Amino acid sequence: MLNLLWLVVVLMVIAALLGFGGVVSSLQSVAWFLIVAAVVLAVVGFVTGRRAL
């Protein structure tokens, strides 16, 4: 559940930073969002798996 929450937060932050305001732009960038979110979650999982943050 916590990972899903982080996924939503990361996607919202990325969308805000990249300036995707429209639904069409977001739909065209779903693959990009998924790639970035997967990388971020992998890094967070790796760090939290090795260290207690």
Swiss-Prot record:
Transmembrane regions: 4-24, 32-49
Organism per entry: Gloeobacter violaceus (strain ATCC 29082 / PCC 7421)
Similarity-based family: Belongs to the UPF0391 family.
Keyword annotations from UniProtKB, A to Z: Cell membrane, Membrane, Transmembrane, Transmembrane helix
GO CC annotation: plasma membrane
Subcellular location: Cell membrane
Superkingdom of the organism of origin: Bacteria
Protein name: UPF0391 membrane protein gsr2640
Membrane topology, as annotated: Multi-pass membrane protein
Signal peptide: none
Keyword Cell membrane applies: yes
UniProt KW S-adenosyl-L-methionine keyword: no
